[in-house]
Each structure stands twice: as structure tokens, then as C-alpha cells.
Amino acid sequence: MIYQSPTIQVELLEDNIARLCFNASGSVNKLDRETINSLDAALDAIQQDSHIQALVLTSAKGAFIVGADITEFLGLFAQEDSVLLPWIAEANVVFNKLEDLPFPTISAINGFALGGGFETVLATDFRIADTTAKIGLPETKLGLIPGFGGTVRLPRLIGTDNALEWITSGKDQRPEAALKVGAIDAVVAPENLQASAIKMLKDALAEKLDWQSRRARKQAALTLPKLEAMMSFATAKGMVFKIAGKHYPAPMAAISVIEQAARCGRADALKVEHQAFVKLAKTDVAQALIGIFLNDQLVKGKAKKAGKLAKNIDTAAVLGAGIMGGGIAYQSASKGTPIIMKDIAQPALELGLGEASKLLAAQIKRGRSTPQKMAKVLNNITATLDYTPVKDVDVVVEAVVEHPKVKSMVLAEVEQNVSDDAIITSNTSTISINLLAKSLKKPERFCGMHFFNPVHKMPLVEVIRGENSSEETIASVVAYASKMGKTPIVVNDCPGFFVNRVLFPYFAGFSGLLADGADFAAIDKVMEKQFGWPMGPAYLLDVVGIDTGHHAQAVMAEGFPDRMGKNGKDAIDIMFEAERFGQKNSKGFYAYSVDRRGKPKKDVDPTSYELLGAEFGELKAFESEDIIARTMIPMIIETVRCLEEGIIATPAEADMGLVFGLGFPPFRGGVFRYIDTMGVANFVALADKYAHLGGLYQVTDAMRELAANNGSYYQS
């Protein structure tokens, strides 16, 4: 053994070829400070051993290196530039040392080599991957850019345009795509990975492969004609800004770094990268996006833990076909759980099967599936008009019409037709789980399972715990949602559960603005362009359905009359009474039509202004700050109430629910990250300015106390 540490072992193989193996004590290899320090020491030991003539980098884990340890680096990001800049420069000395070894080097990549893991392999002369590999630089998804030489080495390896696309998109790359552009040199079967890597090193030693010129190219300036460079970077900036927008600075920063460093050698190019990395690491956007990443890990960790308590879910059933039932059936079947789709009407079953077929056909069109896979998924969906095929399923998802009496009747009926240990769930957005449980003989085997529409696109599932739901029931439904490829969060029963409970105060703030004369289109523009929502409140109501919103609003008003009760008509009532239900009947706040490409198109509709004007009078202009405050303060305070009341367990789960369930702007990180970034005391002061508008704008005593103690919701 040439070198050994808790994370890295180096040994001599045949023909004086050394193997450096990443082998951390945990389940995966991460590029943390300990690993970087070990790599530095290992390279020193390698340099001091005169027998070594070549080096192969391998991993003893199922993945090469999954990336940097972001939890550890968050502490570093909080340091002053005078600390962070020298640290990243020193870390890069290690990768330079790897790149400068006096003999050929290769990385044998299995599984993930992402972020710092991919930057590590970029420092070797050759890269060979097995068929399981995924490589890439996802840092821009975290509000950062690569900091270990990725913006320097990758453009010099695969060309500027390819590197710009890889880095700004942050997407993982399959080995075939990486081979095509030259990011790796070969793709082999997993069992042949190390042997193939050693053969390449032997070819390099025999001068069949020119490792020295490859290395020199990575360390030199980019060989790109000036005019071509100008066009390349200008095109990239235009395309990337169109996608990323002003709220996500990292992709644009990556382009600027590569452009500035294009005429530089390695040393100066790395300095450009380091300066930009440190600047981005300090931004609120990076903190928010890293926070989402960590919150996602927490939620997935909880789901994994729940899996240990869960019963096996091998077969499922959905009651109620149509669009929602078809979407649920598609999601379950496509992720490997066969599902029975039951309805009382043959046309509904045909609609449900048609929805699943349509979604599968779209996957084939995008190149993400094949006719063979489509057939397999459709074979996993069994349509039926009676309960006979349902009797042996492990879990049932009731997805009939959103009406308490109908749901209660169906739930009682299905309980008589399934095994005693089957779990029954209700896909409801507003109806109390405790109320529905009264129709069942075994309420402990029952909970809510709220999917969001469209099911195949929306990642969130709310798992709603009733007062009698057993832990096994909750754990099993969480595990089933995870198996379906969804992100489950567990919430306790209350009107609206979590997501709808916090959404409708936002709509109430919107309605209040309209009652005071605001222009709904102007509100949408501010909330989309400035705050960052994918849709403003008027557009969102049209998409959800004004009739659906009207019903849910009544449920919320009944559940929380002090805060959500109304005096007189609001904008939702006006649209509902005028039978303007939104996209579903082509008229809501906006008018809807289909453009030449067959896509929905929205236009401002004078009729909406006439209806609202008759009730609320002439339009008035509002400052953007007022619009944001009056819509967001109610949502934020209601989210805080949900945490304080135990409806949602943690700020992390609340923020993930908002981002995945409502499209809360990721660059803001969720409600609790938003409050912490603003400062709790600053938010309380802002809310107090609007407290006269009613209970939705009045902060809780606990929040006021947190502000007084200079506290925060996330503990740093």
C-alpha cells in the first residue's frame, strides 16, 4: 500500500501502474475537505514513489464521486472573501497537482461523477466510463458555478459551445452523449472498466496515445478565432438569459467566466473562476437553491425512513377514472406498480385509459420511451366496472368527485370489497380526512393522498394524517408515493391541509387588491416578472378553475371564519356567478383560445374589467411593493401558523411543499427561507404596516417573539 486514509487508498498494480481508489466510510464518496486533503497527501506519496509510471483513479462505491459535500461548504460560504478565496485556490492546487503528474493518468468512472467529482476526472488525461455512468456539472442549479476548474478544463476539452451548454443547463450527461463530444474516451461494460482503463494507460506508455498533447490543450488558452468567439458567447448569452432570466445569475456568470478566461492559460483562468465562484456563493439565490437541495434530501430521507415501517405495495387501485384517475394510473404503472382503474361508467374508463395512452405517446415522441415500454405500462393498467379485480390490492386511491357524501359512500363501499389489511386513501384537496374516516370501520387504515394536477408533472403529494391513521398506514402511503416518483410530505388534517390552506390567503390578498381597484393583469405581471411566480394569481385561478377555487374558498372560509370569512362579494364570486370558470370554458379573468400551433393562448378580456368595475369602481395604480406585500403577507403568515400548529412538521417540508406544489419561486427558497433572508424582524415590521387589512395580515405572538430574539426558522 502506497497510501491509505479513511477516504483514499493507493496501491501498485501490474506494470508499475498505481490505482488511487476513492473509498469513503459512508455509503457514497463526496468531495469534502477531508477527501481533498487526503487526495493532496496521496498525490505527494505517488510523486515520491519512483516506481509509478501511470495512475488510474477508481471508486469502491456504486458511484465515483457524487459531488462536493454541500453541507460542509455552506459553512465556508459564510466566511469572508479573505478566507474563502484562499481556500478555493488551495483546493485547486490539489487538482493541478493531479493534472501535472509526470506520467499518464486516467479516471475509471462508474455511476455518478458530478460537480466536484467530474472536475476531479477532468484533471486526468483520459476518462473511461462504464454504462452506468452519469457525469456533469450541476452547480448552476445551486446558484453557483464550478469552482474546481470545471469552467477552465471542460471548454478546452469538448469545445466552447458544448461546454457552455453543459455548464449553463447543469444537466447530467449519459456516457454515450459524453463520448460523442469527447468528454470521455470510451464506454465499456462495468465488469471491464478497470481492465480497459489499464489498457489505455499501457497504450499511452507505449506512445500509441498522446497524453501530453491532450494535457497541454487543457492548460492553454482556448483556440477559438476572435469573431467565432464573439458570436458563440453572444448567442449563448441570449439563449441562456431567455431561459434563466434575471432571477438566476449563475448560468450567465458561467458564460462570462468562460469568455473572460478564453485567452488565458490555466493559472489566470482559474483566478477568474475563483472570483466569480466566491461572489455567487454569497448571493441569496445560492443560499435559497442550496437550501432547496438540502430540504429535498431531508424529505427523501424521511421517506426512506418511512419505508422501513411500510407494508409492501405490490398492487394498487384507483377509484374514479377520467383525467385525474388516468393520471394516477399512468404514474403508478409507469413506475412499476400495477394498478386497477375502477369506475361506474365505461366512457370514464375510456377517458382514463386515453389519458394514460396520451401521456405515454408523448414520452415516445420526446424519445424518452419506446412502443415496447408503452405496451408494458398499459398492460399494468386494468380497467374495470366492478370490484372483483380490486379485492386483493394493497392500496386504494379514491379519486371520485370532490363531494363529501359521494366520497364517503364510495369509501364505505370499497372497504367492503378489499382485504382487511388493505390501505385506503382519498385524493381530496379540501375535504376533511377525519370527516371521511367516519364512513369506515377501520379508520386506522385510511389517510389522505392529495395529488396535484397534472399528476405526471407535479412532483408533490400531500399525505394527510387523520386522527386515527396508523403509523404503518402513513409510512406505506409515503413509500408508495416515493415509488411513484413523487415527493411526499406528511401533513395533519385541517381545512385545505397545507398547500391549499396557505394558497387561499394569497388569493384573498389578491381579491382585496381588486376590491380596492387594482388591475388583475398588472398584479399578474408584478408577481410573475418581479416576484418570480410561474403564474400570477389571476392566471393561476383560471388554470385551477374558478369554480374549483370558489368551492375551496368556501371550505376555507368555513374552517377559518375569523381570518378567511368574507364580507360581500369578491372577484372570485363575480367570475363564478358570470360562469367564467377559466381555461376549462375559455373565459375567466382572461379569454382563452388556441394559437396556430394548437397551444392555449390567453388574452386580456374587456368583459372581465366590466364585471369587476361594476362592483369595485375605476382602476387604480398600485406600487409593485404594495402588490407583493398584500398578496404574500397572508400566505407567509398562514404558513407560519401551519408550522406552529403542527400541520407541517418542519420549515424544510413547508418550503418543499410550496416549491413543488405551488411553484413558489425556487430562487427565493420557500416561505421560511424568504423570511429568514428578509429577517424575521423586518418581515414583522412590514406585516404590521398592513395589519389594518384584517386577520390574514396579523403575525402570531410566536413570530413576534422570534423577531424580538433576532431568531430565524432555519438554524445555521
Curated annotation (Swiss-Prot):
Question: Could you say which residues are annotated as the site Important for catalytic activity?
Answer: 119, 139
Q: In the UniProt entry, which residues are flagged as the active site? A: 450 (for 3-hydroxyacyl-coa dehydrogenase activity)
Q: Does the record carry NAD as a key word?
A: yes
The residues that hold NAD(+) are 324, 343, 400-402, 407, 429, 453
Q: In which pathway does it act?
A: Lipid metabolism; fatty acid beta-oxidation
Q: What is its EC number?
A: 4.2.1.17, 5.1.2.3, 5.3.3.8, 1.1.1.35
Q: Which Pfam families does the record cross-reference, listed alphabetically?
A: 3HCDH, 3HCDH_N, ECH_1
Stored SUPFAM superfamilies: 6-phosphogluconate dehydrogenase C-terminal domain-like, ClpP/crotonase, NAD(P)-binding Rossmann-fold domains
Q: Which cysteines are joined by disulfide bonds?
A: none
Q: Which UniProt keywords apply?
A: Fatty acid metabolism, Isomerase, Lipid degradation, Lipid metabolism, Lyase, Multifunctional enzyme, NAD, Oxidoreductase
Physiological role: Involved in the aerobic and anaerobic degradation of long-chain fatty acids via beta-oxidation cycle. Catalyzes the formation of 3-oxoacyl-CoA from enoyl-CoA via L-3-hydroxyacyl-CoA. It can also use D-3-hydroxyacyl-CoA and cis-3-enoyl-CoA as substrate.
Assembly information from the UniProt record: Heterotetramer of two alpha chains (FadB) and two beta chains (FadA).
Family assignment from sequence similarity: In the N-terminal section; belongs to the enoyl-CoA hydratase/isomerase family.
- UniProt name for this protein: Fatty acid oxidation complex subunit alpha
Natural source organism:
Shewanella sediminis (strain HAW-EB3)
What are the leading ranks of the lineage? Bacteria, Pseudomonadati, Pseudomonadota, Gammaproteobacteria, Alteromonadales
